[in-house]
Structures are given as structure tokens and as C-alpha cells.
């Protein structure tokens, strides 16, 4: 059987591939900033992203900014593709009164995003745990070696440390994420939710603002998640991590690295949505708007 031609002939297959392109674009464009964010969050000392960057470059070299990228990059095609697929299903399921020829309602978009965030946490938790530990270490062991080590010492439960906090972070954040994207793109280019003819600038701005909104909303939970997953065994659970972190470093610790995260969120999510939408149009042979490249 010729699997690939048959797979690409389906709308599901083309949407899956487009989602993969979006995920790869997001990882490559924002990974150095993500590494800086992780370093800021786990540090017991407040330090600017620039000072951490300077120290990393001096001690560990430029490659340290991309350490651990293989883990999310290897899984991101499947993960991001599934996120868009699951969202498309749930956004319709939560508001079935909307005709299929119309775009999903904003209510369906928000609830579909919440459900999508909860489901994708099952895949994301072990990937992010490995990524975080690779980003924090100064040795050069790879993701497979680290995963085998965790499985040998702690079993599957070790890879899923932080699942609850990941669900708590991602479910509401994804609801806000997709709602913001749909709302902003419609405001910037009225009617585009139905026609799909927004320009590249609209995709980049709407995607970027969606990323910023979702990260600001969930950031304290992300700080707690990073500390739980770093592997030092200093915390017994979510409440213990929150309590100890605030007691030792004050409430500002919950927002440490936010500036770096916001900058990364705008770049990454603008790239994700732009790459996804452009790839989808190419795969469906849909003629894009004449100004898609110029953004006029």
C-alpha cells in the first residue's frame, strides 16, 4: 500500500502535517529563550536573562542554549499536530448548534481549548521533564540516556512527575490561547475566521498575542512545574513546592523569568500559527490572499 499518498489525500493527514510544520517552527524560533526561562525559574537567585546568557556562553558555550532540543523536536510534529486535531474536534463538540459552514463559536473555541490542553498534557509531561533536566545539566548526556535512567530508577511514574501541575497549567491556558487567537485575528481582519484569507501579519500578531496571554495567565503554575520536574527531590508535591518557594524567596519567585517567557511566547506562537496556516493552504492548494507574504 502507498500509505503516504493516501494519508496526504485526507484532510486529517494534511492538517496533521501542517500542525507539524507549526510545531517545528515554534521550537526552533524560541528554544534559546526557553532555556533562559528555565534557568531563571529554577535559580534561587534573581538574575536577568542577559546575565544568565552571558554566564552560559562563557562557561558552557553557545550550544548550551540548544541543549535538550532533540527531545521536544523529536515529538513536536506529532504533539502539535494532535493538538490542532483535538482542538478542531472539541471546538465543534462543545457547541454543536453552530453549522459546519460557520466557524466555531467563541464559547466552543474556549472550551475546546481547555479540553485540548488537558489531553495533550499526557504527551507533554514526560517530554518537558526530560527537556527541563537536560537544560539544567552541564553534562552532555542525551534525552534517550536520561529517559532510560529515569525509567530504571523510578519507573514510568518518574517520567510523569508533574502531570497534575501540567494539566492545571495547560487546560485553562489553552482555552485562553485559542480564544485570544480567534478573537484577535477576527478583529484585525474582519471576516477571516470564515474566509481564511488573513495576511501573514495578522497570523503573526494574533498568534503572538495568544501566546503572551496564555503564558501570563499560567506563569506561576509553570514556575512550580519547573521546580517539581527538575529532579532534585526537594519538594513533596505542588503545595509543598509553592509553600517552600514563596517562604524562601518571596512571592516574586512566581513571576521570575516572566519577561523572557513573554518574549519567547510572542515569537514562538506567532511562528506556530503562521507556519500552520501557510502550510495548510499550500497542502489544500488554496490560493492565499495576495498580500500573505508582504502583510499589506
UniProtKB/Swiss-Prot annotation:
Q: What protein name does the entry list? A: Mitochondrial arginine transporter BAC2
Q: Which Gene3D superfamilies match?
A: Mitochondrial carrier domain
Q: Which SUPFAM superfamilies match?
A: Mitochondrial carrier
Any single GO BP term: proline biosynthetic process
Q: Which coarse location class applies to the principal site listed for this UniProt protein?
A: mitochondrion
Q: Name one Pfam family in it.
A: Mito_carr
What is the induction comment? By hyperosmotic stress and dark-induced senescence.
Q: Where in the cell is it found?
A: Mitochondrion inner membrane
- What regulation of activity is recorded for this protein? Inhibited by mercuric chloride.
Q: Name one GO cellular component term.
A: mitochondrion
**What function does the entry list?**
Mitochondrial arginine transporter that catalyzes the counter-exchange of arginine with lysine, ornithine, arginine, histidine and citrulline. Substrate preference in reconstituted proteoliposomes is arginine > homoarginine > citrulline > histidine > lysine > ornithine. May be involved in the delivery of arginine, released from seed reserves, to mitochondrial arginase and the export of ornithine. May contribute to proline accumulation in response to hyperosmotic stress.
State the family it belongs to.
Belongs to the mitochondrial carrier (TC 2.A.29) family.
A GO term for molecular function: L-histidine transmembrane transporter activity
Q: Which UniProt keywords apply?
A: Membrane, Mitochondrion, Mitochondrion inner membrane, Repeat, Stress response, Transmembrane, Transmembrane helix, Transport
- Tissue expression summary: High expression in flowers, stamens, petals and pollen. Expressed in roots, leaves and stems.
